[in-house]
UniProtKB/Swiss-Prot annotation:
Annotated source species: Mus musculus (Mouse)
GO molecular function, one term: protein serine/threonine kinase activator activity
A Pfam family assignment: TCL1_MTCP1
Protein family per UniProt: Belongs to the TCL1 family.
PANTHER family hit by this protein: PROTEIN P13 MTCP-1, T-CELL LEUKEMIA_LYMPHOMA PROTEIN 1B
Designated name of the protein: Protein TCL1B1
């Protein structure tokens, strides 16, 4: 008899609400921290674009929230899942879900700001 497939990923958060700068809580009371923010630039004809990608890691219950001296006040206070892969933010921006995966014991979301 074949073993059942095991999917360690939890459901995608529908809401991510900021509880402190760089720390979010979803509707299931799971805590997500900003692990990395990347910015890149690209040119399309005469237009220059900036892309912002945010890596969020879900903390394991009882895990201590690490101190992070970076300032994340440019990130939205709330993200809401609008469709299968788009989060709408309270500041009117849209963020594309690039990845929802498991890295060892760490569940991660990667969101990219959609401009234009």
């Amino acid at each position: 008899m074949a073993a059942a497939a095991f999917d360690p990923l939890g459901p995608l958060p529908v809401y991510l609400v900021s509880v402190r700068l760089g720390i979010y809580e979803d509707e299931h009371h799971r805590v997500w921290i900003v692990a990395n923010v990347e910015t890149s630039h690209s040119s399309h004809g005469n237009r220059r674009r900036t892309h912002v990608t945010v890596h969020l890691w879900k903390l394991i219950p009882q895990q201590v929230i690490p101190f992070n001296p970076l300032n994340y006040d440019f990130l939205p206070t709330t993200w809401k899942l609008e469709s299968r892969n788009i989060y709408w933010a309270t500041d009117g921006t849209h963020w594309r879900l690039l990845d929802h995966s498991q890295l060892g014991d760490t569940e991660q979301l990667i969101l990219m700001l959609v401009l234009g």
